[in-house]
């Protein structure tokens, strides 16, 4: 099963999206957006940029855990990964976003 995007609304009324792999695990989390339309634009940006390796910023957090950001052509962060146990697992996470980020399935959980 291929991945999908989930749009949800936070308690403060803002929106976010999460890209989930086919097994349901979250692999990319967005920032908060003021409108659902803006969150959907973020999804479109993932769909457009996720296949390009140059769009991934590979980082290490202060706790020494590897993670990554997916960036748009204008260098704005589109989404951030979870923390990984190793660089190899982070790189597998990037491959998963590359494979699932083109998904056109959007599950709207915002009510």
What feature does the model see in each segment?
Residues 65, 110-111:
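Short proline/glycine- and acidic-rich turn/helix-capping motifs at secondary-structure junctions
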Residues 37:
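Glycine/alanine-rich phosphate-binding loops at beta-alpha junctions
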Residues 1-2, 103:
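Charged, low-complexity amphipathic helices and coil/IDR segments
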Residues 47-55, 98-107:
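Short arginine-rich
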Residues 13, 107-109:
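A cross-family "folded-core" feature that marks the main globular domain of proteins
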Residues 4-8, 14-22, 27-33, 42-46, ...:
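A structural feature that tracks compact, well-ordered secondary-structure segments
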């Amino acid at each position: 099963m291929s991945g999908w995007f989930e749009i949800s609304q936070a308690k403060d009324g803002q929106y976010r999206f999460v890209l989930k792999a086919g097994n349901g695990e979250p692999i990319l989390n967005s920032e908060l957006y003021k409108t659902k339309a803006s969150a959907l634009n973020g999804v479109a940006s993932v769909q457009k940029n996720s296949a390009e390796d140059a769009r991934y910023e590979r980082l290490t957090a202060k706790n020494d855990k590897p993670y990554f950001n997916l960036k748009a052509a204008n260098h704005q962060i589109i989404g951030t990964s979870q923390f990984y146990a190793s660089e190899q697992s982070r790189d597998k996470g990037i491959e998963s976003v590359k494979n699932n980020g083109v998904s056109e399935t959007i599950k709207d959980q915002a009510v």
